Regions:
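Intrinsically disordered, low-complexity regulatory segments enriched in Ser/Pro/Gln/Gly
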Residues: 122-128
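Cysteine protease-like catalytic core of ubiquitin/ubiquitin-like
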Residues: 1-122
Length: 128
């Protein structure tokens, strides 16, 4: 997506991984939301929703956008796990699990993602 934002407007529920513009990845989703509302799954949340994320979601939804709501989720322990967390949050949404209800097994997240990519299928990430 990024600064060009060359994509189709979404008209149904969606899950999207977005780059914040500051070396960070997050997951957003409208699954189970009131129309126009989008949930933000951010493993490095600091009480501020990045303007770039808001602008990308507005571009995705056009006139139907109302607002973003932060979902309290597990926070990453290092400065380099945001991408794997964004994929894990997305995967849990696909499988209809709520990321705030469990704790991912961080040391096993990257090996799991590598295995999923080799197999060509995303499965639930390991939890503790």
């Amino acid at each position: 997506m990024g600064p060009i934002r060359n994509f189709d407007i979404v008209t149904s529920e969606f899950i999207q991984i977005l780059h914040t513009g500051h070396m960070h990845w997050v997951c957003v989703s409208s699954i189970g939301c009131t129309p126009g509302i989008v949930k933000l799954y951010d493993s490095l949340y600091h009480d501020i929703i990045e303007e770039e994320v808001t602008e990308q979601v507005k571009s995705l939804m056009a006139d139907s956008y109302i607002g973003l709501v932060n979902v309290p989720v597990q926070q990453q322990l290092s400065g380099s796990d945001c991408g794997v967390f964004a994929v894990a949050f997305s995967t849990s949404l696909v499988y209809a699990f709520h990321s705030q209800d469990f704790t991912f097994d961080i040391p096993n997240m990257r090996p799991h993602l590598c295995q999923c990519l080799r197999m060509g299928e995303l499965t639930m990430f390991p939890t503790i």
